Amino acid sequence: MQDYKIEFIKFALSRNVLRFGEFKLKSGRVSPYFFNAGLFNTGADLARLGEFYAAAIQANRLAYDVIFGPAYKGIPIGTTVSVALFNRFGLDKPVCFNRKEAKDHGEGGNLIGSPLQGNVLLVDDVITAGTAIREAMDIIAANGATLSAVVIALNRKERGKGELSAVQEVERDYQCRVLSIIELDDLLAFLETDSEYSRYLPSMKAYREQFGVA
């Protein structure tokens, strides 16, 4: 496992973004872990978060023209990712985000920032039902752009109502790569080597066995 993945897990734990225990999800499932990226909510947190996204983007050698952060959670993520890519790698990439309701005055429209054109790198926190990605795809298509890849913080690798995960459904429906800073297997690998949290490994393995995807 790459160093940036280990560091991200430790960072998420230190901010209570990632917690182990017993959590009731919206789906009704009881999960042995919970991830809430909204708790990355200070300048220092967001700066580091952007660096982890940038590391994942560079590690996967993604080709793209513009970064798109869909409203609402994707807006600060897209912003901090663009700054991190410049500060760490010297890449000055344009960034764009949408507003939920179009304005009919001022700059108008529902997009802010760079024009949404060419190959688009979409950044968000997680994909649960895939609804936000589908809404973003409508916006990308309406502007004549192409979705190049999606990068999220965590891939739960968990089945939805069918046999596929939400991430797999997005990859199938839009023929694009969905990458993540970390995924469920990374959490398991971390638990296997960390004495402080290793007690959660059995419940995590059991959850993956019941709900996980390949």
Curated annotation (Swiss-Prot):
InterPro entries from the UniProt entry: OPRT, Or_phspho_trans_dom, PRibTrfase_dom, PRTase-like
Any GO molecular function: magnesium ion binding
Catalytic reactions on record: orotidine 5'-phosphate + diphosphate = orotate + 5-phospho-alpha-D-ribose 1-diphosphate
Enzyme class at the top of the EC tree: transferase
Assigned EC number: 2.4.2.10
Cofactor: Mg(2+)
Protein family: Belongs to the purine/pyrimidine phosphoribosyltransferase family. PyrE subfamily.
Name of the protein this chain belongs to: Orotate phosphoribosyltransferase
Source organism per UniProt: Actinobacillus succinogenes (strain ATCC 55618 / DSM 22257 / CCUG 43843 / 130Z)
